[in-house]
């Protein structure tokens, strides 16, 4: 923050308030929080409301639209096996593979055949649920490329819908309007027309977004493989 010279305000988290806040949240929204991230975001909106801000802009959708997840690398490598695979594989092996902790996200061929099983993960209802549920992953195939299909399903059915729903509820709790400018339909349709080889480039995901921000964002962020 100091390096970027940004105005900011830290959100302090008091663990003693957790149960009290959780009860307050659940009573108002009538459903549980899916992740701890939702609670932290609620705390952030609480602080924003104290400053009397009425509109919040978020970066929601950037990972889904521009290819920002680790499994997107594997999808792209499977798409490009007969093209510039070797060059991109070397970049991935050197810069990205060491960052990945899940071994299933390091096996290119296994991913192509089992990505639905990997993304669903363990069915915890069999361990902890009163009732067991069979979890299925919707997998629309709108494009001929695995990467673009994965991004489409991320956008429509998987990660983004729950993220948007959670942010809407947290924002509405404090009468704040939240907006996600990356989800402009013109941006989405334009990116969907681009060949997958250009979405991840030189080992960097979100390559197009990095290009657009190259004269705006600091180099240590643009050139960070973890961003």
Where are these regions (language model features)?
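ATP-dependent adenylate-handling active sites, centered on carboxylate activation for C-N bond formation
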Residues: 1-135, 169-215
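Charged, low-complexity surface segments at secondary-structure and domain boundaries
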Residues: 8-11, 134-145, 227
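Structural motif
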Residues: 34-35, 141-155
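Residue-level recognition of hydrophobic positions within alpha-helical transmembrane segments
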Residues: 60, 144, 150-152, 162-164, ...
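Intrinsic disorder/low-complexity signal
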Residues: 62, 106, 138-139, 153, ...
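Short Ser/Thr-interspersed hydrophobic loop/turn segments at strand-loop and sheet-helix junctions
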Residues: 155-170, 191
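PAPS-dependent sulfotransferase catalytic core
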Residues: 217-227
């Amino acid at each position: 923050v100091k390096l970027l010279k940004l105005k900011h305000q830290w959100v302090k988290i008091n663990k003693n308030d957790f149960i009290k806040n959780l009860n307050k949240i659940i009573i108002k929204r009538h459903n549980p929080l899916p992740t701890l991230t939702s609670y932290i975001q609620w705390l952030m909106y609480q602080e924003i409301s104290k400053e009397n801000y009425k509109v919040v802009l978020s970066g929601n959708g950037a990972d889904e639209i521009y290819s920002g997840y680790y499994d997107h690398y594997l999808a792209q490598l499977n798409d490009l096996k007969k093209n510039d695979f070797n060059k991109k594989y070397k970049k991935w092996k050197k810069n990205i593979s060491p960052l990945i902790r899940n071994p299933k996200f390091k096996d290119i061929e296994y991913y192509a055949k089992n990505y639905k099983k990997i993304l669903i993960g363990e069915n915890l209802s069999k361990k902890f649920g009163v009732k067991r549920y069979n979890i299925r992953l919707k997998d629309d195939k709108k494009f001929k490329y695995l990467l673009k299909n994965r991004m489409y399903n991320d956008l429509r059915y998987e990660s983004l819908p729950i993220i948007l729903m959670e942010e809407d509820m947290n924002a509405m709790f404090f009468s704040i309007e939240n907006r996600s400018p990356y989800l402009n339909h013109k941006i989405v349709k334009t990116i969907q027309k681009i060949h997958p080889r250009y979405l991840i480039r030189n080992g960097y995901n979100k390559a197009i977004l990095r290009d657009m921000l190259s004269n705006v964002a600091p180099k240590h962020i643009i050139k960070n493989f973890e961003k």
